[in-house]
């Protein structure tokens, strides 16, 4: 992609962002990001979160999902969050900055988690976009595969998984893989997700262990 095209695309994203009612509402209410509303919509439909839960949040920064989840799970719950980028503190959230694709970071993350004791794994991870779908889609699918592998390592029986996935090559097979591991799997497109975005959210419940 040329710099001119990339600049035009970036400019369009910025205009959409500042015109977007969800982004504006997030700023007004002091929410970390518009992602707060995506998790709120998923929770309204699927009731994944309950007080006292233990949650792992991958790709957490700037903290929209953790911020919403912390409100639901309360003081008796805990959230272990991880991201490459820094994240301002959130009460009830233990944050680890680093790339969990690296063994040392993954080990540090797992040290904070009791095996098979996590109630929900949630992942809003996305790769740095190159503007070339043949590059971007495999990168995105690699991240969601890692998130699914995290479920295998830490999720309790009957636990839940919510993950952002971009539709494209590998998507259908990924949904099949998730269905093999969970009793119920739904694909959600929240109203707060931009219509032209290929992102959807897989909501899986009843981890078979």
From Swiss-Prot:
Coiled-coil intervals: none
Keyword Metal-binding: no
InterPro entries: RNA_methyltr_RlmE, RNA_MeTrfase_FtsJ_dom, rRNA-MeTfrase_E, SAM-dependent_MTases_sf
Catalytic activity: uridine(2552) in 23S rRNA + S-adenosyl-L-methionine = 2'-O-methyluridine(2552) in 23S rRNA + S-adenosyl-L-homocysteine + H(+)
Top-tier EC class: transferase
A Pfam family assignment: FtsJ
Highest taxon listed in the record's lineage: Bacteria
Active site: 164
Function: Specifically methylates the uridine in position 2552 of 23S rRNA at the 2'-O position of the ribose in the fully assembled 50S ribosomal subunit.
Family label: Belongs to the class I-like SAM-binding methyltransferase superfamily. RNA methyltransferase RlmE family.
NCBIfam families recorded: PRK11188.1
The name this protein goes by in its record: Ribosomal RNA large subunit methyltransferase E
Annotated source species: Vibrio atlanticus (strain LGP32) (Vibrio splendidus (strain Mel32))
């Amino acid at each position: 992609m040329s710099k001119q095209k990339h600049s035009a695309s970036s400019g369009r994203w910025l205009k959409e962002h500042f015109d977007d009612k969800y982004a504006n509402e997030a700023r007004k209410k002091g929410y970390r990001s518009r992602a707060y509303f995506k998790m709120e919509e998923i929770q309204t439909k699927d009731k994944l979160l309950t007080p006292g839960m233990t949650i792992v949040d991958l790709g957490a920064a700037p903290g929209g999902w953790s911020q919403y989840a912390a409100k639901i799970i309360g003081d008796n719950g805990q959230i272990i969050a991880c991201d490459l980028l820094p994240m301002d503190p959130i009460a009830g959230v233990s944050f680890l900055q680093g790339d969990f694709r690296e063994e040392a970071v993954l080990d540090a993350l797992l040290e904070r988690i009791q095996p098979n004791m996590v109630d929900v794994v949630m992942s809003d991870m996305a790769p740095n976009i190159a503007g070339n779908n043949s590059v971007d889609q495999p990168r995105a699918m690699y991240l969601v595969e890692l998130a699914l592998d995290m479920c295998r390592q830490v999720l309790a029986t009957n636990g839940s998984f919510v993950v952002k996935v971009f539709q494209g090559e590998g998507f259908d097979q990924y949904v099949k893989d998730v269905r093999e591991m969970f009793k119920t799997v739904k694909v959600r497109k929240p109203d707060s997700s931009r219509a032209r975005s290929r992102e959807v959210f897989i909501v899986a419940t009843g981890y078979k262990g």
